[in-house]
UniProtKB/Swiss-Prot annotation:
The active site is at K211. The gene is GPD. One of its GO terms (biological process) is glycerol-3-phosphate catabolic process. Homodimer. A motif (Microbody targeting signal) lies at residues 365-367. The keyword NAD applies. It is an enzyme of class 1 (oxidoreductase). Transmembrane segments: none annotated. This is Glycerol-3-phosphate dehydrogenase [NAD(+)], glycosomal.
Amino acid sequence: MISTKRHINTNELLHLSKAVVFGSGAFGTALAMVLSKKCREVCVWHIKEEEARLVNEKRENDLYLRGVQLASNIIFTSDVDEAYKGAELILFVIPTQFLRGFFQKSGGNLIAYAKARQVPVLVCTKGIERSTLKFPAQIVGEFFPSNLLSVLAGPSFAIEVATGVFTCVSVASADINVARRLQRIMTTGDRSFVCWATTDTVGCEVASAVKNVLAIGSGVANGLGMGLNARAALITRGLLEIRDLTAALGGDGSAIFGLAGFGDLQLTCSSELSRNFTVGKKLGKGLSLEEIQRTSKAVAEGVATAEPLVRLAQQLKVTMPLCQQIYEVVYKKKNPRAAIADLLSCGLQDEGLPPLFKKSAATPSKL
């Protein structure tokens, strides 16, 4: 068993000459702000040249993270080769549905560079690819060696990360020593951003994807005026759906009750800062998905994830009633109240939770 009782002191932290972030949305920009405390230079790749130039001039990414002044050592560029040249760490924060296309179109030299120099790759994207039903790290793993890959996940709203509000996340790799090295790189000296290492990459990716779908459901319940008790029930039962899918995909489940699992699920399902929660709330109030998307520039990843998630669950024969009903509300235009009624018509059931502790007849309960 891997011990989690490990403390990091400031002397253990690692600093780099340069890091590159591929993906310039709110979260990519926020992670660049974290890295600006650990690197001499941080380069952020943005797809449009003119927009990248304007960000550099204004020192603000007002498209996705308005009001946050960029650190002086952060540079935006639309040139892939310029972005990664000299980088000692590569982060991917490109939306899941566009990740493969990026590698196929622009990734050749980047991939060769990372392989030749053994540059660690941190996957920060969340979701499930529609065409293959793969998670982001699986997609990235088709192009980069597995020994370079880690996953970052956990409760981390971009605006708080970018402005140095205290945040804890998980860094996962199949090799705990790889995860611990990334932990030392990403944790900041002022402890405003702290990473915990784990080996449950599957659990981290499943939780990161499914929580966005569940957050839409939490928003729907809020829009219907269902209250906090309903939200707590959704979070609890939703966590079990994450558990069951993680088990079916071969994860060890250790991340489910950690930062990437319960932590991120609770946050995303409980705040108007969550784009997924906000989309769900508007659906609950009667707006159509088309109406919502016309007025929002930011991506609510749960919308893109719901459909492939349901197909993946069916393929693996995993029962996910909450995610199924959320999918039907989002894509089949099912009335949200009808979805709630269907969830509640399943009959009385046992809670279905295994005991955490073994109890023998010789040691009866003291309560």
